[in-house]
Amino acid sequence: MSASGKEKPLKDVPGSYGVPVVGALKDRLDFYWFQGEVEFYKSRMEKNQSTVFRVNFPPGPPGFPEGHGIVLLDQVSYSVLLDNAKVDKRDTLIGSYMPDLAFTGGYRTLPYLDTAEEKHTTYKSLMFEILHESAQRFGPELSSAFDRTAQEWEAKIAKDGSVESLSTAGNMVIQFLYKTITHQDPMATMGDDPHSVYMAWTGVQFAGIAYTNLPHITEELLMHSFQLPFFPIKKKYEQIVEFFRSAGSGLLDLAVTKYGLDREEALHNLVFSFGINTRLGLLKMFPPILFFIARAGAEFQARLKQEIRGRMKKREDAASIQALGDLKLVKATVLEVFRLMPSIFVAFGRARQDLEVESHDARYKIKKGELLGTHQYFVMRDPVVFKDPHSFVPDRFMGSEGAALLPHIVWSNGRETDSPTPTNKQCPGKNQAELIAVQFIAEMFLRYDSWEVTQESSVSATKLDVHLCKLVKRS
């Protein structure tokens, strides 16, 4: 059990940044190459005998700003990052650096704004209105896009024996997301593979923290040492922008007339919010869902199938918000997948003033301006909170005991029991994302009796390598 309040000893934050530049370089090589990010934090947590310690957040010098910071790897210490009064999120989306503004049209976009900035409240209010106005269309558009993707999966498995799920789900996400919010199909203007256009823009923009299939030395020299320039993907970004400029003209009118925003700035904000945050968040949740349900076996799949088909008498029910809300086991399964594999593993902020941060068993003094970060692999597998923290337990969040654990689910940059507002940093689409995940599982079991993934399939904090190899059509 954790000690409480002032009973906890006050300690200096352990750990060291090492020799300038050299220490940062060593940590970066360990993080990306020699250890990998989970072992990187785990080994230092064991060395320091603490879930709170100093570390060089990558990528760091020489090509990126110094990444000196303090990592918070348990449920108690992490909570300070949810306190807007204590932590400033200005320009800390991915740590100590942010990509060149050329990647976002020259504007700081919503995820880089702190809650104390007036535009944060304005832009997030705009996002809420767009999501609210689109709410009834998400279900039907997902059903339509899922049908096309399922047909693609079936054809690919028949031809090649398996199909990779992440990239094939990419166009499904873009189609149903943008048809929902703009009423127009991006494939009509961006071609048959808009996913590749978005991934090029995303990949170059965030190359400093990205993983690829390149040899380690090539990846290190090409991507993690210096920020890549904007010009190689300029035309692809212009494709994305022009789609939103045309298809999203009504959204831009709303931004200008109701919220008093500059039209061009609003354009690039919507491109980023829907093209990075929303698109990637949705995309990254589908492969883990397929993986964990497949690996859970036939008996568990039968339980899900029974719940879904018992409440959904016809295919159209999969798009019904009311029907989806009745799927308690499916919702618990979604939360367990999100616990193990959140779409975003990291979060950062800077201390607004000198403060104390508590862990389960100690208190630590933090100075104003220090960079604080976390990795949710550890936070949502905190053994003090979760029994068998590394195991997939799909009914973990069922019943009264499960409900008591809900505040510890923080995939949305906020607690499951909290709601996003214009004045906090919690994902504005939290509720929609969970509903979409529930619908996706329902769509799968309304079309298939079961499915399997290849033995080589795996999911981790850095890679979603899930290949479907068997789809058993509904009998």
Curated annotation (Swiss-Prot):
Family: Belongs to the cytochrome P450 family.
CDD domains referenced in this protein's UniProt entry, alphabetically: CYP74
Reactions it catalyzes: (13S)-hydroperoxy-(9Z,11E)-octadecadienoate = etheroleate + H2O; (13S)-hydroperoxy-(9Z,11E,15Z)-octadecatrienoate = etherolenate + H2O
Pathway: Lipid metabolism; oxylipin biosynthesis
Entry keyword set: Fatty acid biosynthesis, Fatty acid metabolism, Heme, Iron, Lipid biosynthesis, Lipid metabolism, Lyase, Metal-binding, Oxylipin biosynthesis
Organism: Selaginella moellendorffii
Residues engaged in binding heme: C427
A GO molecular function held by the record: hydro-lyase activity
Cofactor: heme
EC number: 4.2.1.183
Disulfide bond positions: none
Keyword RNA-binding: no
Annotated GO biological process: fatty acid biosynthetic process; oxylipin biosynthetic process
Biological function: Divinyl ether synthase involved in oxylipin biosynthesis. Catalyzes the conversion of (13S)-hydroperoxy-(9Z,11E)-octadecadienoate (13-HPOD) to etheroleate and (13S)-hydroperoxy-(9Z,11E,15Z)-octadecatrienoate (13-HPOT) to etherolenate. Has no activity with the corresponding 9-hydroperoxides (9-HPOD and 9-HPOT).
Superkingdom assignment: Eukaryota
Protein name, entry field: Divinyl ether synthase CYP74M1
Cross-referenced Gene3D superfamilies: Cytochrome P450 (1.10.630.10)
SUPFAM superfamilies (UniProt xref): Cytochrome P450
Entry annotated with the keyword Lipid biosynthesis: yes
A matching Pfam family: p450
